[in-house]
Amino acid sequence: MDNHGPRYPYPYGQYPYPYPYPAPYRPPSSEPYPPPPTNQYSAPYYPYPPPPYATPPPYASPPPPHQHTSGSHSGPLDYSHNPQPSSLAAAPPEYHRHSFDYQPSPYPYQPQGNFGAYGPPPPHYSYQEPAQYPPPETKPQEPLPPPQQTQGFQEYRRQDCLSTGGTGHDNVSNSGSSYPPVDELLGGLHISTNQPGPSVPQLSSLPSNSWQSRPGDLYGYPNSSFPSNSHLPQLGRVDSSSSYYASTESPHSADMQMTLFGKGSLKVLLLHGNLDIWIYHAKNLPNMDMFHKTLGDMFGRLPGKIEGQLTSKITSDPYVSVSVAGAVIGRTYVMSNSENPVWMQHFYVPVAHHAAEVHFVVKDSDVVGSQLIGLVTIPVEQIYSGAKIEGTYPILNSNGKPCKPGANLSLSIQYTPMDKLSVYHHGVGAGPDYQGVPGTYFPLRKGGTVRLYQDAHVPEGMLPGIRLDNGMSYEHGKCWHDMFDAIRQARRLIYITGWSVWHKVKLIRDKLGPASECTLGELLRSKSQEGVRVLLLIWDDPTSRSILGYKTDGVMATHDEETRRFFKHSSVQVLLCPRNAGKRHSWVKQREVGTIYTHHQKNVIVDADAGGNRRKIIAFVGGLDLCDGRYDTPQHPLFRTLQTIHKDDFHNPTFTGNLSGCPREPWHDLHSKIDGPAAYDVLTNFEERWLKAAKPSGIKKFKTSYDDALLRIDRIPDILGVSDTPTVSENDPEAWHVQIFRSIDSNSVKGFPKDPKDATCKNLVCGKNVLIDMSIHTAYVKAIRAAQHFIYIENQYFIGSSYNWNAHKDIGANNLIPMEIALKIAEKIRANERFAAYIVIPMWPEGVPTGAATQRILYWQHKTIQMMYETIYKALVETGLEGAFSPQDYLNFFCLGNREMVDGIDNSGTGSPSNANTPQALSRKSRRFMVYVHSKGMVVDDEYVVIGSANINQRSMEGTRDTEIAMGAYQPQHTWARKHSGPRGQIYGYRMSLWAEHMATLDDCFTQPESIECVRKVRTMGERNWKQFAAEEVSDMRGHLLKYPVEVDRKGKVRPLPGSETFPDVGGNIVGSFIAIQENLTI
């Protein structure tokens, strides 16, 4: 989102959905892993759309429990009988999967490439098994006896929830407390000491009572496929500020465990890798819908139609969610009206959790909530060796007893650690067979070109020249110039999506002439008069209204109603799109989604000249909205442009009241232009969203329909299709391979399958009453895991991995990104290899820094940073390097700021705030302000780049909150695998250009960001710049990079800087404060 604080709250909620990368699977075959080919991926590259798939390969999934890996099977598999234990399968595929045992059916758009990512490949496809991870040589032991006792279920807040009566609700609680009541939970807890055990315990060495002695699991995080404030089970009340969560210092202590039944403890181990899980079926589930059955029996006695309509049996609608350390990592679809459901569903999911058990929670889905049926737990110690655990297990209730005689769940689970997943060992890879990020809706598109942008505009000569390989020089892009030219040159279509689009914004401001006087609205209106189809898809801010002459600007000040009114009598079609929940969601959930969440994508899609009187599609993707406050240059002026290029474009939501003489808020952002096949995927995203938003409902059915507004480019002869668009040879040093990622769900797009069993054909995740594309999170995890040297991130937010915080583990910020970065660094420390992570964030979230929402965001950010440094320090201690290095030799956080002396003429305006102690007066006196980092980008090893609209927090990564889009790209001729040294392609030039902007210099050590010399040099520059920014004396700042104003000691403890506990001039605790407000307002 783009604004914060009381003026623009940025509410966040819990993460209600897992992180599986779904993929279609055939029924388990007898040969799940064929001999490896010469390279890891050999699926051919198809045109768009690809041809219908042939019969899926027989190896596409692991075998079911009843089928052995030897032999062959030429006919359909029979799943009518109970699965029996089988021999251990070979190592699973190396990517996250989540699939059903159903034959995928053709659909209009079929992504292609790697079969796991884009659907089944042709029969000749083969998959490489990781050579260094041989299959276990022994068969698994018989299923272990069922536990006689089991702990109470941990926190499953906002999804899998259960009241004391057994029923949970999916809607948001209306109580004032931020946390659900579970006070008496501690009353049943038993503290036990857990002696260190073997790091990789053998199944045969497990204690005989391991099933009877489940540990208390108080680093449980919300199982949030179904948002709710209730827990599972509801055992009393815990206040977050005073509970065990708030006081626990160790996020993953192996020395102390809590058990609800006092039956011993289990060892907490780090699961970092992938889990290969099959959920086959359940039997003899209890009927949880007895109330409905009673009503049915009552009405069944009535004569006539009612009797005939109620004769069918009413029973449970079960589903299973899989959680590790309380964070949901997988979820089956709901089987309606079944006490013997058969799912045959597969998950291949990334994990980065300290946990003692894996939980399989069986629930009954209801319209108003969900009821607990029971639980199956698998101790992590049993799977840690890599052995496949498979069998049928009794489903136990919260008392540790069978929920019903004979009720059981058949499943299998196998863990593959990171060091056995070779796909993450070589960066983006080399050669034509690399297929990008698997398990995504859109495939990797080869042979395109990309232009990378920093800020809205870079004037000529403002940044230094950067030499690249092949004697080339990096060319600094001019984003809004290029957008203006692309729109002006369009002949067929101009499609724009935005969180905010303002018709008054001027894209060209550095030249004299008509272009500099032309507003965006005038440009679009003139193009529509030329016959170009101009469509604007803008988020409909629910707080802005224009009804019968009554107008409100809205809390977010997005100008949505103003822009709609401007184009009202033109041929430009403006569709204001609210962020709606599905019809099957509860009323409260619908209100929450519609009020809190947004459409956050920022795209411009136009047709462009393809030569030969043909047209092609190009697209702009990134973080820049076409609205006020966004135009800026790498100088990021505060006062000097207030009477020139920013005269009619003042933006600074930090200040309230009199703005006279205040500094503007400088704006730093990242954007990109895509030319090639991937641009058509951006077009597909727009079409899917437009068709969904244009579908009339309610009173809108009587209004003008927008359904026919989209151009059918396949029916326009002069517009090339994706398979015909010009491509660049992979051998061309300027060739790019590009992939589009999204965070979005089926409530915001048209085209997702209605049947969840068909969802895996498009690599979608199942949620309650919704299908989810969360491939942005998938892409970040893949890129971080594959990083070998350094990671450079610029992002508006940095919150996540709350399941590993030292407090408030249950808020639901469960995205893996911060934990994956910390574990990557820890892995490199243990390997005695250099690695560095540089993370640039805003000084504070946009808005009033003393506001409750802003302070809570800073608090969660502090918890995230603290967790990462503690993880790094632990690795230093384990390797005996804590004396030689500190955590900041590997990980550093920065922000941006600027300061201007008064030049000859003070352009800050006339007058000054009357109160000398207001933030306005103090900022004008000190002549300093932060540069707001609105970027959403990451560079890995100078070979891979991600740029989009998604922030690093739950709201952007979850897929069911804000809608987001991003692109990931690399140049095949500029990778470590090909060069065997640091690549010097366009991505390297882009990163160096950003550093030149932030530090006002280019040092030789910048070419090796992972080196200790570079890390310390950059940190020293940031510390020096912060001192200049915070000093009493006013001076011009050359560089803008500031060390984030917290103190990190050698043990990784993060504290406020002594004497600088609050932000200069504007106030607000730098490390935030815990203020009890609704969680989804801040994560």
UniProtKB/Swiss-Prot annotation:
A Gene Ontology CC term for this entry? plasmodesma
Residue ranges of every copy of the PLD phosphodiesterase domain listed in the record:
595-630, 929-956
Give details on activation and inhibition: Inhibited by neomycin. Up-regulated by PIP2 binding.
Q: Where does a 1,2-diacyl-sn-glycero-3-phosphate bind?
A: H600, Q796, H934
EC annotation from Swiss-Prot or TrEMBL? 3.1.4.4
Q: Which Gene3D superfamilies match?
A: C2 domain (2.60.40.150), Endonuclease Chain A (3.30.870.10)
Task: Provide the pH dependence.
Answer: Optimum pH is 6.5 to 7.5.
Which catalytic reaction applies to this protein? a 1,2-diacyl-sn-glycero-3-phosphocholine + H2O = a 1,2-diacyl-sn-glycero-3-phosphate + choline + H(+)
Where in or outside the cell is it found? Cytoplasm; Membrane
Q: Which UniProt keywords apply?
A: Calcium, Cytoplasm, Hydrolase, Lipid degradation, Lipid metabolism, Membrane, Metal-binding, Repeat
Q: How does it sit in the membrane?
A: Peripheral membrane protein
Where is this protein chiefly located? cytoplasm
Q: Does the keyword Transcription regulation apply?
A: no
Q: Which GO terms describe its molecular function?
A: metal ion binding; phosphatidylinositol-4,5-bisphosphate binding; phospholipase D activity
Manner of cofactor binding, per the entry note = Ca(2+). Requires micromolar level (PIP2-dependent).
Q: Does the keyword Lipid metabolism apply?
A: yes
Q: Which GO terms describe its biological process?
A: defense response to bacterium; lipid catabolic process
Q: Where is the active site?
A: H600, K602, D607, H934, K936, D941
Please list the disulfide bridges: none
- Give the highest taxon in the source lineage: Eukaryota
**Domain notes for this protein:** C2 domain is a calcium-binding fold, and the binding induces conformational changes, promoting the protein association with membranes. These conformational changes occure at micromolar Ca(2+) concentrations. Exhibits three Ca(2+)-binding sites. Also binds PIP2.
What protein family does this chain belong to? Belongs to the phospholipase D family. C2-PLD subfamily.
Cited function: Hydrolyzes glycerol-phospholipids at the terminal phosphodiesteric bond to generate phosphatidic acids (PA). Plays an important role in various cellular processes, including phytohormone action, vesicular trafficking, secretion, cytoskeletal arrangement, meiosis, tumor promotion, pathogenesis, membrane deterioration and senescence. Involved in regulating stomatal movement and plant-water status. Can use phosphatidylserine (PS) and phosphatidylethanolamine (PE) as substrates only in the presence of PIP2.
Return the protein name: Phospholipase D beta 1
Q: What is the lineage of its organism?
A: Eukaryota, Viridiplantae, Streptophyta, Embryophyta, Tracheophyta
